[in-house]
């Protein structure tokens, strides 16, 4: 009896499957999918993948005025083997400062009310990737290129306090 019930349900299931197959035979007109991609074979190489910028020692005067620059330091990202590359676009990413989101936050546990500001050699500010700024574009002309920047520590809160003022900023470069 169980065998007959299983056999009948198996036949019923096969009938439903067969009906489903017959119902799907008219698929309509065929379509095309076009794929496109640009594959680059070369990008510049960086002289150093990690940079250390020693900002020295600075003194925080009280009362602290917002906008006061405490320390400035030039630094350069050196690119080599750039043949065939015409443009580099640099994005910098790190947590933005809570008092001024156009600047980079310092690591927790140290100085407060101070943020890191980065500008290119023309004075264009490099804003953290998640903020309202745009990446900075650099023209590449030749085998090597130097991307000149200036870092500065800036007071962003009148209640600024002293302490270690380290910041880690990740950067990425896109080439064209």
Curated annotation (Swiss-Prot):
It is found in: Fimbrium. It comes from the Bacteria. SUPFAM superfamilies: Bacterial adhesins. Residues 1-23 form the signal peptide. It holds the Pfam family Fimbrial. Keywords: Fimbrium, Signal. Its main location: other. One of its GO terms (biological process) is cell adhesion involved in single-species biofilm formation. GO terms for cellular component: pilus. Induction: Induced during the exponential growth phase. Belongs to the fimbrial protein family. PANTHER family: FIMBRIAL SUBUNIT ELFA-RELATED, FIMBRIN-LIKE PROTEIN FIMI-RELATED. Part of the lpfABCC'DE fimbrial operon. LP fimbriae may participate in the interaction with eukaryotic cells by assisting in microcolony formation. This is Probable fimbrial subunit LpfE. It comes from Escherichia coli O157:H7. The gene is lpfE.
């Amino acid at each position: 009896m169980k065998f007959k019930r299983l056999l009948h349900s198996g036949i019923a299931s096969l009938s439903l499957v067969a009906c489903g197959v017959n119902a799907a035979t008219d698929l309509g007109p065929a379509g095309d999918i076009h794929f496109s991609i640009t594959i680059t074979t070369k990008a510049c190489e960086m002289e150093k993948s990690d940079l250390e910028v020693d900002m020295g020692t600075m003194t925080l005067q009280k009362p602290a005025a917002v906008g006061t620059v405490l320390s400035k330091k030039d630094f350069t990202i050196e690119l080599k083997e750039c043949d065939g590359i015409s443009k580099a676009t640099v994005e910098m990413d790190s947590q933005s400062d809570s008092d001024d989101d156009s600047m980079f936050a310092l690591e927790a546990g140290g100085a407060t009310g101070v943020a890191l500001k980065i500008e290119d050699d023309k004075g264009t500010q490099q804003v953290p990737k998640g903020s309202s700024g745009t990446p900075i574009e650099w023209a590449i002309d030749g085998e090597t290129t130097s991307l000149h920047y200036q870092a500065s520590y800036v007071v962003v809160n009148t209640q600024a306090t002293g302490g270690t003022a380290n910041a880690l900023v990740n950067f990425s470069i896109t080439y064209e």
